[in-house]
């Protein structure tokens, strides 16, 4: 049999198409209880290409395309099935979220990609995001091919932690706005702050249990009081995942911001909210001097590894540049 990469054939799986959230959770509960693995598919812009590469495919896939309850959108509520382009075009969405959304991929992909899919985006690594034949040629990948006893190619001889990189855009902006994330399963619902949702492991990625999914995100009442900016490093402006991304958000005050938050993406296995660094800069605010100190502290706080296109040293240097660029609005009087 020819297994050439150019064939891009997905492995066989059973597709489930529930018409409601209740039905979706019933299906997921039955599969989870019987020990059968499955994936949720929303827009499919990340999952389906991964299936074509034979990256952790499952025997069952549950489509959320017909679950209308997950598509609600308002100033404080964003459903998991809201399309990314809807965030760009909606008048009810926070301006920072709209801007970040406009910088994700391309219009074509944003019309398919969803909020939940972006938040739950699989981590990436150039040893992982390759064809099955390529991975076999280097004796497999720890993240994808655990059953082979493969070693991690980024940090060899440890095989206790996958360091694949989280390269989605929405999470740092939502963190800076104080968003909460809401999950559901056949056993009930639970909620948490967005930073609590992520788990620093390139394989597990987050706290979702088998049979559980993201239903929506909510913003606090003071979200409209926050303004900010997002700056992103990538190879091509109209396509690529962030090699580094920085959100700086603040509440306006007299002569200085009254509150300040900074979050990053593309620099580790999870997006990070840098509250200590932001608080230190805010404690003795001196305008450009404080911005320079903030940018340097964020550079020191991140620790990227060699598993994306740009080398870690360059990405760390650019984090300082991106932080200063995202802070320019702080100097507008």
Predicted region positions:
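C-terminal structural segment of proteins
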Residues: 3-333
């Amino acid at each position: 049999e020819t297994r050439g990469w150019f064939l891009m054939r997905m492995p066989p799986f059973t597709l489930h198409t529930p018409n409601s959230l209740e039905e979706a959770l019933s299906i997921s509960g039955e599969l989870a209880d019987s020990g059968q693995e499955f994936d949720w598919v929303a827009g499919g812009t990340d999952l389906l290409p991964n299936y074509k590469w034979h990256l952790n495919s499952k025997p069952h896939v549950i489509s959320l395309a017909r679950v209308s309850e997950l598509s609600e959108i308002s100033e404080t509520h964003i459903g998991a099935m809201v399309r990314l382009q809807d965030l760009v075009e909606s008048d009810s969405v926070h301006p920072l979220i709209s801007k970040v959304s406009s910088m994700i991929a391309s219009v074509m992909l944003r019309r398919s990609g969803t909020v939940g899919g972006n938040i739950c985006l699989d981590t990436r690594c150039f040893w992982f995001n390759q064809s099955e034949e390529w991975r076999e040629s280097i004796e497999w990948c720890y993240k994808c091919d655990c059953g082979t006893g493969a070693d991690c190619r980024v940090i060899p001889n440890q095989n206790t932690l996958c360091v694949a990189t989280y390269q989605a855009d929405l999470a740092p902006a939502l963190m800076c706005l104080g968003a909460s994330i809401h999950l559901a399963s056949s056993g009930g619902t639970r909620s948490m702050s967005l930073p609590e949702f992520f788990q620093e492991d390139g394989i597990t990625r987050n706290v979702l249990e088998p049979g559980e999914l993201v239903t929506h995100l909510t913003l606090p009442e003071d979200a409209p009081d926050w303004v900010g900016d997002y700056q992103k490093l990538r190879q091509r402006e109209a396509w690529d995942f962030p090699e580094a991304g920085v959100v700086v958000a603040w509440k306006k005050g007299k002569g200085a911001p009254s509150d300040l938050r900074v979050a990053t993406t593309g620099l580790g296995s999870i997006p990070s909210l840098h509250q200590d660094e932001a608080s230190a800069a805010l404690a003795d605010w001196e305008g450009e001097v404080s911005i320079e100190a903030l940018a340097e502290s964020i550079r020191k706080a991140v620790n990227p590894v060699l598993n994306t296109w740009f080398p870690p040293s360059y990405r760390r240097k650019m984090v300082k540049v991106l932080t200063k660029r995202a802070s320019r609005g702080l100097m507008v009087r």
